[in-house]
Each structure stands twice: as C-alpha cells, then as structure tokens.
From Swiss-Prot:
Coiled coil: none annotated. It is found in: Mitochondrion intermembrane space. This is Cx9C motif-containing protein 4, mitochondrial. It comes from Lodderomyces elongisporus (strain ATCC 11503 / CBS 2605 / JCM 1781 / NBRC 1676 / NRRL YB-4239) (Yeast). Residues 11-53 form the CHCH domain. GO terms for cellular component: mitochondrial intermembrane space. A motif (Cx9C motif 1) lies at residues 14-24. Belongs to the CMC4 family. Disulfide bonds join C14-C45, C24-C35. InterPro entries: CMC4, Cys_alpha_HP_mot_SF. A motif (Cx9C motif 2) lies at residues 35-45. Keywords: Disulfide bond, Mitochondrion, Repeat. It comes from the Eukaryota. Pfam families: CMC4.
Length: 90
C-alpha cells in the first residue's frame, strides 16, 4: 500500500462509526442518551486506531488522543452522555 493510500485510509478511520452517531442523533432529536452504543463504538474504534497508528496519528472522525483518553475515563466513571435540556416556556 502506498504512503498516500495509507494516509487517506488513516484519515478516514472510524468514519462509518461517526456517521452512525450522526444518523442516530438525527433520528432521536439529538438526544445523546439514545445513542450511547454508537458513541462507545466510535471511541473503541478510535482507541484501536491510535493503538495501531500511534498517538500522533490523525483521523477526522476521532478526537485527539488525549481527549479520547479523557472521554474513555469519564465513561468508565459513569459520566456517559450529555443531558438533553428541555426548553419550557411559560
């Protein structure tokens, strides 16, 4: 595989997982709590991506390595999803 092809493949890493999150959010009124499985899948894909390509690798679909580590730690502590605030008008 050429260097250019590898770079292109790396930049597209986890794209299907990121698209699945967008589809889920759009289908559920942007309620993140209903898309937890897809978010977990993306983070796992990104974790694998960094393990295979190094912490300085780049993918448009993955958070930077340090942020991914923070997100994974938060999720392990049960701080999983953003809460959807309802706008109530009187």
């Amino acid at each position: 595989m050429s260097e250019e092809s590898q770079a292109s493949q790396a930049s597209q890493a986890c794209q299907a997982k990121a698209c699945a999150i967008q589809d889920c959010l759009q289908g559920n009124g942007y309620n993140e709590a209903k898309c937890t499985k897809y978010i977990d899948d993306l983070y796992q894909c990104c974790k694998n991506f960094y393990e295979e390509n190094g912490v300085d690798a780049k993918s448009v679909c993955c958070p930077k390595f340090k942020l991914l580590q923070l997100k994974l730690k938060q999720r392990s502590l049960g701080q999983i999803d953003a809460t959807l605030l309802e706008n109530k008008r009187h």
